[in-house]
Curated annotation (Swiss-Prot):
Record keywords: Cell cycle, Nucleus, Repressor, Transcription, Transcription regulation
One protein family per Pfam: RB_A
Gene3D superfamilies per the UniProt record, alphabetical: 1.10.472.140, Cyclin-like (1.10.472.10)
Protein name: Retinoblastoma-related protein
Subcellular location: Nucleus
Comp. bias regions, Polar residues: 866-893
UniProt-annotated stretches for the region Disordered: 866-898
Region of interest: Domain B: 725-855
Role of this protein: Regulator of biological processes that recruits a histone deacetylase to control gene transcription. May play a role in the entry into mitosis, negatively regulating the cell proliferation. Formation of stable complexes with geminiviridae replication-associated proteins may create a cellular environment which favors viral DNA replication.
GO MF entry, a single one: RNA polymerase II transcription regulatory region sequence-specific DNA binding
The family this protein is said to belong to: Belongs to the retinoblastoma protein (RB) family.
GO cellular component assignments: chromatin; nucleus; transcription regulator complex
Residue ranges, annotated region (Spacer): 605-724
Length: 1006
């Protein structure tokens, strides 16, 4: 069996002349960056020296693959890492920030972050040896990247709002610029506003810089500008009844801005007060009540509660105000190592180059797939997934439609504001204690568990939203923010818990739910899910997923048990938050449940005893949960930085609450729901399947079984234990997710149905017979290898480069999937080979995949036992009355969302989703309004079922309809049911008879 061969990385030509990489790094640091801190440079040189062999091995995978660019990336990575992780407090080190490093290296910010994740995976063990095992938390790479993405979105929001509300002018000469032709908002007023916003971020928001709070800050700045910028430069039409809120015969400015940008009026007024205080403190301006001084600028505007600063925008003082704000920002951020946030004033800054978000928005956390910023508000392809159920928006008695019907484009900022509105209007008014109906269930247990439930909720939510866990950086506002988030999460928790108890009692025909309501792990999962939705709504920078798992002591596998039930029983949940939970569940399935420490392995050793030795050898088992008392102790420690949760673990007794390492819940329901994988994008099609016809066939899942002991007999019978049932259900979800991704890749690669079924069959066999291949890996790594292996045994001219090229176009693609695959060389000692812990996909294929699955590949090869056994020849004599031309039964699972759907019971009318291959070419930002796509609404949160009517009304409203379709005419040539049925399957075709794997040598596409 021929192996893939890699082309060796080129050596640096300059090395032969004695000009070493260390010398070039020293020149870069001292000459380009002007660094003279010998201690800092010594640490950076040491990291470079220990990692340079990894640089030379990965030159083709960095940037465009040139040696010079790869070195510049590596130098930037090294300096940034040492700057963040070093404990040296010298002034030179403190003066170095990311923007300075990237300017010297001629790199832009977004490309830097995209490649940084690959660097950290490669050098992780080196960083751990040099800086300790907590280096990832101290480096805060994901948090820093998220902060950049948020700032970019906020800067775009500010620019668009400014252009909408003001003429673009220069205060010095009152020269009005052409808004349409201006590349940036070249205005002193514009600059003043952004600098005031940065002052709010530095002095007011500080650690809790959420997207929601920052948006309130941005809108408060707009309010100050509207109050002080001369009225003849305003574009705001006070007679616009759709946008302006009138109080009597005058416009309410604050209420109008809330109406326009979805902010809370109470929060906006509080933020506006803080912004006014900054103007007083930094600019030394004297405030006065607008109602008393009655400036001409506020004619026809309600002045109650507004503050006015005389001369704030005068030409004589504006320049000095800008200077003071810049000076204040520089002083406040001098010791910081992150972004210089003033770069967003110039959208043509080289740091916001064509490869960055200014030209293409990237998926957060290392996704290399680039999208235009407009794609964040326009649809992006969504892959289906067999996860959680979908609910249509619910209209409540208070008249609030979840999410609202908004005309604003769905951007990260508007999404955050609309989901925050749901928290304010639906969740915030709820009581912060169990309702009477919930108390009925809590008191109906063998003992009253109400005190336990409330105490646990307080402790766990205090751990997730700590009041004093930030040491000297803590402030009153931080504590107020944390308390507000705790209340929101607690109210949501009680609300969903009540709905779950009601559903369980109906299934069991009893109100005594002792086994469920006394289960510690169940409650922590529910609290974690509630807190995650609150965090996702506010879009925090410092508490990204999986923070809720770490602070509650549960694992990804645990959380996956409640996601479906949470979505099912909270009908008011906005569509964006349902998508967020669905994307989390997909993230859990594809990789997180396979990571070390997943409680899935604790169930797997019971369900599959043969795997226990390998699981134990790799140390994959999950640790017991920390006790509630340990978490409470952790919360009460207020000195400096809190110690790791693991240091305070008190192992719970075996058997408490069943078994705290319980397996996946029993679930016999067939689930086929689709997942949107990036909460920053709105999908073209959710492809959410209607489950109404399935609910009558399958009973809803019983949560009692989800958290039962692994060795307990399954309530479903059949002689299975709960662990076996859990693993079977979990594997079925993995297979369904794989089927969806296989289907997407087959469509992109334009492969036959036979290849699709072979890849699917091979994946199934690997999951059941070679399960260890998934340990510590991503399921897409196995899928990519399956595609290549099947293409070789089928004698297709399909290269790994083509496979990876098309995989890059998949929405879930992350470069680390094919660049960094885990390999356990200890298990290969017999071969005498060794290497790094993470290798590229080709090395993994050659060294691990082929030796493990070669027998399985032979089975599915043309003429193999599995393949031949699955092919049923077409019957020549139809004795059962079946149509001879009926398609053969496919082993590939049905994906109804990809097939035409009959939408009329009386007529042969079908609606089919736009396929991805056509969608990529057709749907651009300028043309997307011409298409109606499944799952995308014409208005925010509106049910997609209303879309066709809305589009028809829009198209037909201004023109006469010259004729109508005659559905009763049999000669009009409509497609019949039989034609559609036959079109869904590809007829059996001939295939190569050879079962040998012909594998060509090729270079991996990186």
């Amino acid at each position: 069996m021929t192996e893939l061969k890699k082309i060796p990385s080129p050596s640096h030509p300059a090395d032969e002349g004695g000009n070493t990489i260390e010398a070039r790094f020293a020149h870069f640091s001292k000459n380009d960056l002007r660094l003279d801190d010998d201690k800092f440079l010594a640490q950076a040189t040491k990291l470079l020296d220990e990692s340079k062999h990894l640089l030379m091995a990965n030159v083709p995978a960095l940037g465009t693959g040139t040696l010079d660019e790869a070195e510049r990336y590596w130098f930037a990575f090294v300096l940034y890492s040492v700057r963040k992780l070093s404990e040296n407090g010298d002034s030179v080190e403190k003066g170095l920030n990311l923007c300075q490093i990237l300017r010297a290296a001629r790199l832009n910010i977004d490309d830097f972050y995209k490649e940084l994740y690959q660097f950290l995976i490669k050098v992780g063990s080196i960083l751990s040896n040099l800086y300790g095992g907590d280096w990832q938390k101290r480096l805060e790479a994901k948090e820093s990247h998220t902060n950049f993405v948020h700032l970019f979105c906020l800067s775009k929001k500010y620019k668009n709002a400014y252009r909408e509300l003001f003429s673009i002018v220069n205060a010095n000469n009152d020269k009005q610029l052409n808004v349409a032709n201006a590349s940036g908002c070249e205005s002193d007023y514009y600059r003043f506003g952004w600098l005031l916003f940065l002052a709010l971020r530095v002095h007011v928001f500080r650690p809790c810089k959420t997207l929601v709070s920052c948006t309130h800050g941005l809108v408060s700045v707009l309010a100050i500008l509207l109050i002080h910028v001369p009225a003849h430069f305003r574009n705001l039409n006070l007679n616009d009844s759709e946008r302006i809120v009138m109080r009597g015969d005058k416009a309410d400015l604050v209420a109008s801005l809330c109406n326009m940008y979805g902010t809370s009026e109470d929060e906006l007024r509080k933020t506006l007060e803080k912004a006014n205080n900054l103007i007083t403190d930094i600019l030394k301006k004297k405030p006065c009540l607008a109602s008393e001084c009655k400036p001409a600028n506020l004619e026809n505007i309600v002045t109650d509660g507004l503050v006015y600063f005389e001369g704030l925008m005068d030409e004589s003082s504006l320049s000095s105000s800008i200077y003071l704000l810049e000076k204040d920002y520089d002083a406040a951020t001098h010791d910081m190592d992150g972004l210089d946030e003033m770069i967003f004033l110039n959208e043509n800054d080289s740091l916001l180059g064509s490869g960055s978000l200014s030209g293409g928005a990237t998926n957060s956390y290392g996704n290399g797939t680039k999208r235009k910023l407009d794609a964040m508000s326009s649809p992006a392809k969504t892959i289906t997934s067999p996860l959680s159920p979908h609910r249509s928006p619910i209209c409540h008695s208070n008249g609030f439609i979840v999410g609202g019907i908004s005309k604003m484009a769905s951007t990260p900022v508007t999404t955050a504001m609309t989901t925050a509105k749901w928290l304010r209007t639906v969740i915030a008014p709820l009581p912060s204690k169990p309702s009477a109906e919930l108390e009925k269930f809590l008191t109906s247990c063998d003992r009253d568990v109400t005190p336990d439930v409330t105490r646990r909720a307080q402790i766990i939510l205090e751990a997730i939203f700590p009041s004093s866990g930030l040491g000297q950086n803590a402030s009153l506002m931080d504590n107020i923010w944390a308390e507000q988030r705790r209340m929101e999460a607690m109210k949501l928790y009680f609300r969903v818990l009540q709905a779950l108890c009601t559903a369980e009692s109906q299934i069991l025909h009893a109100n005594n739910l002792t086994s469920l309501l006394t289960n510690e792990r169940f409650h922590r999962c529910m609290l974690a899910c509630s807190a995650e939705l609150v965090l996702a709504t506010h879009k925090t920078v410092t508490m990204l997923f999986p923070t809720v798992l770490e602070r509650t002591g549960i694992t990804a596998f645990d959380l996956s048990k409640v996601i479906e039930s949470f979505i099912r029983h909270e009908e008011s949940l906005p569509r964006e938050l349902r998508r967020h939970l669905n994307s989390l569940e997909e993230r859990l399935l594809e990789s997180m449940v396979w990571e070390k420490g997943s409680s899935m392995y604790n169930s797997l050793i019971v369900a599959r005893p043969a795997l226990s030795a390998e699981i134990s050898r790799l140390g994959l088992l999950a640790e017991p949960m920390p006790s509630l008392d340990a978490i409470a102790m952790h919360n009460n420690m207020s000195c400096g930085v809190l110690p790791p949760m693991q240091a305070l673990l008190k192992h719970e007794k075996h058997g408490q609450n069943g078994d705290i390492r319980s397996p996946k819940r029993v679930c016999t329901e067939y689930r086929s729901v689709l997942v949107e994988r990036n909460s920053f994008t709105s999908p073209v099609k959710d492809r959410l399947l209607a489950l109404n016809n399935l609910k009558s066939k399958f009973p809803p899942p019983i949560l009692h079984s989800a958290f039962a002991s692994p060795t307990r007999p399954s309530p479903g019978g059949g002689g299975e234990t709960c662990a076996e049932t859990a693993v079977n259900v979990f594997f079925s979800k993995i297979v369904k997710l794989a089927a969806v991704r296989i289907n997407g890749m087959v469509e992109r690669l334009q492969l036959s149905q036979q290849i699709r079924e072979s890849v699917y069959c091979l994946f199934q066999k690997i999951l059941s017979q070679r399960t260890t291949l998934f340990f510590n890996r991503h399921i897409d790594q196995i899928l990519l290898c399956c595609f290549y292996g099947v293409s070789k045994i089928s004698q297709l001219t399909l290269t790994f480069k083509e496979i990876i090229f098309n995989y890059r176009k998949q929405p879930q693609c992350k470069p680390q999937v094919f660049r960094n695959v885990y390999v356990d060389w200890k298990a290969l000692r017999r071969t005498g080979k060794s290497g790094p812990d993470h290798v590229d996909i080709i090395t993994f294929y050659n060294e691990i995949f082929v030796p493990a699955v070669k027998p399985l590949l032979v089975e599915i090869a043309p003429g193999g036992s599995a393949q031949s056994g699955s092919q049923v020849p077409e019957a020549k004599n139809n004795t059962n009355g079946v149509n001879p031309s009926s398609p053969r039964t496919s082993s590939f699972p049905s994906l109804p969302d990809m097939s035409p759907k009959k939408v009329s019971a009386a007529h042969n009318v079908y609606v089919s989703p736009l396929r991805s291959s056509k969608m990529d070419a057709l749907i651009s930002h300028s043309s997307r309004s011409y298409y109606a796509c499944v799952g995308e609404s014409t208005h925010a949160y509106q049910s997609p079922s209303k879309d066709l009517t809305a589009i028809n009304n829009r198209l037909n409203g201004n023109r006469k309809v010259r004729g109508t379709l005659n559905f009763d005419d049999v000669d009009v040539g409509l497609v019949t049911d039989s034609v559609v049925a036959n079109s869904l399957y590809v007829q059996n075709g001939s295939c190569a008879s050879s079962s040998h794997m012909v594998v060509k040598s090729e270079q991996q596409d990186s």
